[in-house]
Amino acid sequence: MTLITDSESIGVCESSYTPEEERRIVTELNNEAEADLKEGNLYFVISNRWYTRWQRFVGLLTEEFRSGEPSEVTRPGPIDNHDIIDSESDASDPQLRMMLEEGVDYTLVQQEVWRKLVKWYKGGPPVPRKLISQGFYTKSFSVEVYLLCLTLTDSRDESTTIIRLSKQASIGQLYEMVCAGKGVAKEKARIWDYFEKKKSVLLDPSSEQSVEEAGLQFNQDILLEVDGSASSQFVMSLAENELAMVPLEPMRSDAMDIVRGGGTLSNGHSNGFKFSFFGRNTFKDDVSSRTFGKGEKRGLGGLQNLGNTCFMNSTLQCLAHTPPIVEYFLQDYRSDINAKNPLGMRGELAIAFGELLRKLWSSGQNTVAPRAFKTKLARFAPQFSGYNQHDSQEMLAFLLDGLHEDLNKVKRKPYIEAKDSDGRPDDEVAEEKWKYHKARNDSVIVDVFQGQYKSTLVCPDCGKISITFDPFMYLSLPLPSSRTRSMTVTVFYGDGSHLPMPYTVTVPKDGSCRDLSNALGTACCLDNDESLLLAEVYDHKVFKYYENPRELLNGIKDNEHIVAYRFKQMHKGPGKVKLEILHGEQEKSSDRGPKCFGTPLVTYINKEPLSGTDIATSISGLLSPLRRVHMSCVVNSGNENGHVPDESSRSILSRDTETEDNDRELSLSLLRDYYSFNLQPLESDSVVNPGSVTKVLVKWNEKEHEKYDSSYLNDLPKVHKNVLAKKTMQEGISLFSCLEAFLAEEPLGPDDMWYCPGCKEHRQANKKLDLWKLPDILVFHLKRFTYSRYFKNKIDTLVNFHIHDLDLSKYVKNEDGQSYLYELYAISNHYGGLGGGHYTAYAKLMDETKWYNFDDSRVSAVNESEIKTSAAYVLFYQRVKSDSETSDMKMD
């Protein structure tokens, strides 16, 4: 029996087009699609790993080695989307893994481009998504990558069904989908919003409202009831069914009592409060329990994660523990709402935020589901809609801007012509600019968060100096980035002589695969007649071989798994091809084929017809270090002192304890390709014509696990693991050094040149920033994420920041006599890498010194000594007023 080669079995359609022709065709198709954007256009989600390889192949991405030489590229294999597909999803209906990021994990290509790529390269699986229109004031197009996922409970038999639909689908369309799937007449069906297994709102079958506007959240429950069927266990209590009487504005005298623990807020009548009737779909957020004990602390409520909303929850908790903001929103702020501001959200965002803040401060230590706020956020900021992970600082920037516009007391903004400083004193110009700014922008956000900095531009040619004073809401501070990176790579022996061993090496951040190979060679004592083959392992398969020494390392992410296969030079060379050995085992609860596990092994074989016995012998040699040692062998091989041999000696010893007959008992199958995972049994008399890479699957059963220790194949370490261990102050950098880097003089970039009024030309001027006026609430954004054309990176450097007595006086150029001493009260943290990770918040209650960790719905106390970590991303400080300022306030 003759088996075809792997390159034939994959069925790759070798394109007759050159790379240049492929690039031209795709570029033309993209231009045509851009000119014809409309709702409903179809796009396909494609693995960014594969697409980046294709871009390099056709010249859409070009990389250079540090010497300036271009990096060589090879033609990519079949399209492989398995790295972005949830491994637990059905093969007939593949679902994307959660928390994927566009440009990092996946790329979107329009339908005609997808068709061409599939024609040229085959592969898949296809993941189609539609273009939708979003936005309230201005419409924008976006591809709905993640559909809304709902769990439908049928009250008749309590069965559950997963439903996926567009967030823009109407409630009426939801009824049609459910009724069609359940075979129920629409007029007999009732669908309830069943959030947290509670019947809260009966959805209207005739409603054109979208499921997103109705407040339905990712992975939440909905309940189907059918007329004439019993469903008593789903009866809703009267309290759940009535319209909420949401307290809008407490009287000023009681507001801070709530914050400090006095007084109560309820969901019913209470003296001293004004009420407004709202339906569930506007401002009635769900609180898991509306009662709390007497004297229970307020402000310790958690926020439920509604589907990758930890970024939002982190920001909200920091703002919900900002004293002047809490005080303002717990008092009567309605008179400040500017519903007619064309730059605002008609006051809806401010009211949604105010009601959410009120829930947090009235819920004791219970959890609040911010559904109404998220619905408003998605309406006015479609970039935060859907279920992708986002940036907490970007969320903060939008929210502060949005709240300002909703609460801007200026109804008509006067036109004010900008004036140059013309040599006038700085304090005069700064005061004038601030006055003009306040004439157009007057809100609590400006009063609390906004400061002013001085910007000085100097023309390098004529010496013209231009000084301006501009407002700021927060300070984005640069972090110094290391020029090197550490990488952990596991080395496997291609001849099966030793056990695999992980090595951690330091390489240049902009280095190449040659740098990594050289560093690994030194670490593992590579002989002169040996070489290393680098590869990326994903989902227990070899995703890519790094055979070009010039290929840059910046394409390797920290969360990836890289291995190196060690070979004698004699094992490689002309006439040799790769034999790739994968490991699989049958899942007991599944009737599908074997599931891969562990790390593939790689060796080289002759490029000539081979028998199944030849293949089995090669595989047995690679597995030999993993053979378990029988106790009798260990005892007999010990030295006279009874010492047990080391692992390498034991593996060699055990190899001699097995017979060649046992070597051939392995269950082997030829793997045609990763995409279809089509297996063909490999018998001893089979004849294999090797291709460039021949893939063979070893099926492990109890016998194999008894004979071999597969633990050495598992637990492959990541390239770099983010460790948030406690570090000393000397290991990090100070917040002051970051601030000084922000304020340092530097030339403008070539793409950001300044028009010099003296030269009448654009010049690459020198720019210097100085702090002039600092706000009561000062926010520092630590710029941990860096972006370049080919690479995105997170800087995990520990920033040593002050918790108490942050004195910024020497950085403020305005001598106004104010105190610029600050106390830290909240931190937005980011854990993990790019395109995902997790956000939390540290915050302390007003009038308390105790800190708390807000991790979505989980709230716990934390020691002050533990809040300084390399996860700190956004720092919130409150200014400590001087004695004279405090006295002036008392007199007022």
Curated annotation (Swiss-Prot):
| Catalytic residues (positions) | C310 (nucleophile), H838 (proton acceptor)
Region entry Disordered: which residue ranges? 69-89, 636-660
Q: Where is the USP domain?
A: 301-880
Which GO-annotated molecular functions does the record name?
cysteine-type deubiquitinase activity
Q: An example of a Gene Ontology BP annotation on this entry?
A: protein deubiquitination
Q: Where is the composition biased (Basic and acidic residues)?
A: 643-657
E.C. number, please? 3.4.19.12
Which major enzyme category is it?
A: hydrolase
Keywords on record: Hydrolase, Protease, Thiol protease, Ubl conjugation pathway
**Record's keyword annotation contains Protease:** yes
Task: Report which superkingdom the organism of origin falls in.
Answer: Eukaryota
What catalytic activity is recorded? Thiol-dependent hydrolysis of ester, thioester, amide, peptide and isopeptide bonds formed by the C-terminal Gly of ubiquitin (a 76-residue protein attached to proteins as an intracellular targeting signal)
Q: Which CDD domains match?
A: Peptidase_C19R
* Cited InterPro entries: DUSP-like_sf (IPR035927), Papain-like_cys_pep_sf (IPR038765), Pept_C19_DUSP (IPR006615), Peptidase_C19_UCH (IPR001394), Ub_carboxyl-term_hydrolase (IPR050185), USP_CS (IPR018200), USP_dom (IPR028889)
Per its UniProt record, what SUPFAM superfamilies does this chain match?
Answer: Cysteine proteinases, DUSP-like
- The DUSP domain extends over 17-132
| Cytoplasm found in the keyword field | no
| Function in brief | Recognizes and hydrolyzes the peptide bond at the C-terminal Gly of ubiquitin. Involved in the processing of poly-ubiquitin precursors as well as that of ubiquitinated proteins.
Q: Which family does it belong to?
A: Belongs to the peptidase C19 family.
User: What name is this protein filed under?
Assistant: Putative ubiquitin carboxyl-terminal hydrolase 11
Organism listed in the record: Arabidopsis thaliana (Mouse-ear cress)
